């Protein structure tokens, strides 16, 4: 049976600058539970401890968000996203105290070693620990397998490949998921973003390649161009004969019900989202890039290219300002030198 992890109340928070209310969290968690969703993930878009001036502040803290969801769930498991460095061991302790069932410990795709203590902390408490490799497009299959094996050794009960930038195509997804499925003794999952319009297709390919866990959000509510749309994914999974705890009818009832308390607008694939997917940048960076381009008066798409050259990962918003400022200085020098580009002068 395929496990569906619903990130609406976590990744969806990115789409509204992390402003979900307690009432919205309670209503959606209750509805998702009634729809038969396996895991309901809750929190700031960047996970436990993510609320900050840099990443965006939530109107309510982690404790209230998790307590609210916990009270609403009966059969669905409560999950959280945790990035070492943004969150601390104390944040996991709080989550476990409240009754979180699944802790998804997420690292950059080449930094799995920093997940060890947090996976072990979760397992010691008798809860489920998943490892998550973010920005998975930035590493080849063998590297991802080596990193996933570390998480498996630390005690992770599954490893999820996260296509954080929406960069991947079906062939890339198949190669990476197959490599992990063949090389691990634990389940493999996949988390897609829709920057290139491939979220559902990539999720189906991941399942064909042996993945047993897929992430999705109601109406695609999520960072950038959105996540895999839950309703569309479940419909396609039914067509392909995949067995789950839910049905298309139940998730459609869930989606329609959100119009009274959440009403997430179905994300459109804007040019900026396509650019972030094409250049392999974290989907949540788009509003920050647009703001910096406007403030410094630089070309937005040139800024995407520069940031791609820096190989940004999540949590490096300060580099967006740094590169926008550098582009602005180069533009000013170019004007002062009669149109000669700074990079030409330094070549």
From Swiss-Prot:
Gene Ontology BP terms: catabolic process; L-leucine biosynthetic process
Catalytic activity: (S)-4-hydroxy-2-oxopentanoate = acetaldehyde + pyruvate
Binding site for Mn(2+): 11, 191, 193
Binding-site positions, substrate: 10-11, 164, 191
Residue intervals of the Pyruvate carboxyltransferase domain: 2-252
Keywords from the UniProt entry: Aromatic hydrocarbons catabolism, Lyase, Manganese, Metal-binding
Molecular function via GO: 2-isopropylmalate synthase activity; 4-hydroxy-2-oxovalerate aldolase activity; manganese ion binding
Site (described: Transition state stabilizer): 10
Residues of the active site: 14 (proton acceptor)
Primary enzyme class: lyase
Bilayer-spanning residue ranges: none
SUPFAM superfamilies: Aldolase, post-HMGL domain-like
Assigned EC number: 4.1.3.39
Family the entry assigns: Belongs to the 4-hydroxy-2-oxovalerate aldolase family.
Name assigned to this protein: 4-hydroxy-2-oxovalerate aldolase
Species in which this protein is naturally found: Burkholderia pseudomallei (strain 668)
Gene field: mhpE
């Amino acid at each position: 049976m395929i496990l569906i992890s619903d990130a609406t109340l976590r990744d969806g928070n990115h789409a509204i600058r992390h402003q979900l209310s307690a009432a919205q969290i309670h209503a959606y968690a209750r509805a998702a539970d009634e729809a038969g969703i396996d895991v309901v993930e809750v929190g700031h878009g960047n996970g436990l401890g993510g609320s900050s001036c840099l990443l965006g502040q939530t109107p309510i803290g982690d404790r209230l968000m998790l307590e609210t969801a916990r009270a609403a769930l009966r059969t669905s498991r409560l999950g959280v996203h945790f990035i070492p460095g943004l969150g601390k061991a104390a944040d996991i302790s709080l989550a476990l105290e409240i009754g979180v069932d699944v802790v998804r410990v997420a690292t950059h795709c080449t930094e799995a070693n920093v997940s060890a203590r947090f996976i072990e902390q979760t397992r010691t408490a008798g809860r489920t620990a998943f490892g998550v490799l973010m920005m998975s497009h930035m590493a080849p299959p063998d590297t991802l397998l080596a990193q996933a094996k570390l998480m498996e050794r630390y005690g992770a009960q599954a490893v999820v490949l996260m296509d954080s930038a929406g960069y991947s195509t079906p062939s890339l997804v198949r190669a990476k998921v197959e490599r992990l499925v063949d090389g691990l003794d634990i389940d493999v999952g996949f988390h897609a973003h829709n920057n290139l319009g491939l979220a559902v297709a990539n999720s189906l390919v991941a399942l064909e390649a042996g993945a047993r866990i897929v992430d999705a959000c109601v109406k695609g509510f999520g960072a950038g161009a959105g996540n895999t749309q839950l309703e569309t994914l479940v419909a396609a999974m039914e067509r392909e004969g995949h067995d789950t705890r839910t049905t298309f009818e139940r998730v459609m009832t869930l989606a329609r019900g959100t119009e009274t308390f959440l009403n997430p607008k179905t994300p459109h694939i804007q040019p900026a989202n396509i650019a972030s997917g094409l250049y392999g940048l974290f989907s949540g960076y788009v509003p920050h890039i647009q703001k910096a381009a406007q403030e410094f008066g630089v070309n937005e798409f040139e800024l995407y290219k520069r940031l791609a050259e820096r190989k940004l990962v999540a949590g490096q918003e300060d580099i967006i300002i740094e590169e926008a400022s550098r582009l602005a200085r180069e533009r000013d020098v170019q004007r002062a030198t009669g149109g000669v580009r700074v990079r030409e002068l330094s070549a």
